[in-house]
């Protein structure tokens, strides 16, 4: 079958997903071809699960998430070779690097340190660096970004250009529920060691998260200067650290009620200051 245009791909994928209970390992023809082509386009970075408009708003292309989900119904489990000591794995998603040699790595233009795992349909842009880390299917990692040791980039997560994901960082994946958007880290962000950003939250351009900051949809993000409380999105060029919110309540035993975790914006800087100032200096109170 010849390659379909994006509009045709979307139509086939949407229809197949609406009838997904009929999709099995034996499904052939147009549906299988459309899913495989969609995943190949994701893998090559020619399409993305989410794209940013000129107004800064992100548009989620749900049909591409549907293509990823349909691939699980279409593909059987199989032995994956290549482990140390001739060990193997058991999965239905191949490695992005399956069959790659020197020519493919040079053409792709990024570094992949031994034990970096990237699943097929994830895109890694040129000049990115992958330390021993994990990038799940449908994700996008931008140019010049560092994915440090034991960091994980979840399914369909969108990581911008020149981002630093420090050691042990977790960027959550969002495939389901279908209406949920992916977790997004915009350009030039720094995410401190062991931090977690999940549940489709957005970290806007140039923001800095200190070590051990956890942000989900229900996490209070408090601007210390104004008292503003926000959820799900860190504003551009914000410097954020882990904090706690005192409770106004008293427990029955007369003691103050426990404080609850929050993320605190300790300052906001402009792009010029962000580019000229070291991360540690920004995080000092």
From Swiss-Prot:
It is an enzyme of class 2 (transferase). One of its GO terms (molecular function) is 2,3,4,5-tetrahydropyridine-2,6-dicarboxylate N-succinyltransferase activity. Substrate binds at residues 111, 148. The keyword Cell inner membrane does not apply. Coiled coil: none annotated. It catalyses: (S)-2,3,4,5-tetrahydrodipicolinate + succinyl-CoA + H2O = (S)-2-succinylamino-6-oxoheptanedioate + CoA. Its main location: cytoplasm. InterPro entries: DapD_Trfase_Hexpep_rpt_fam (IPR005664), Hexapep (IPR001451), Hexapep_transf_CS (IPR018357), THP_succinylTrfase_dom1 (IPR023180), THP_succinylTrfase_N_sf (IPR037133), Trans_hexapeptide_repeat (IPR050179), Trimer_LpxA-like_sf (IPR011004). Pfam families: Hexapep_2 (PF14602), THDPS_N_2 (PF14805). Its EC number is 2.3.1.117. CDD domains: LbH_THP_succinylT (cd03350). GO terms for cellular component: cytoplasm. Keywords: Acyltransferase, Amino-acid biosynthesis, Cytoplasm, Diaminopimelate biosynthesis, Lysine biosynthesis, Repeat, Transferase. It is found in: Cytoplasm. Pathway: Amino-acid biosynthesis; L-lysine biosynthesis via DAP pathway; LL-2,6-diaminopimelate from (S)-tetrahydrodipicolinate (succinylase route): step 1/3. GO terms for biological process: diaminopimelate biosynthetic process; lysine biosynthetic process via diaminopimelate. Signal peptide: none annotated. Belongs to the transferase hexapeptide repeat family. Homotrimer. NCBIfam families: dapD, PRK11830.1. This is 2,3,4,5-tetrahydropyridine-2,6-dicarboxylate N-succinyltransferase. It comes from Allorhizobium ampelinum (strain ATCC BAA-846 / DSM 112012 / S4). The lineage of its organism: Bacteria, Pseudomonadati, Pseudomonadota, Alphaproteobacteria, Hyphomicrobiales. The gene is dapD.
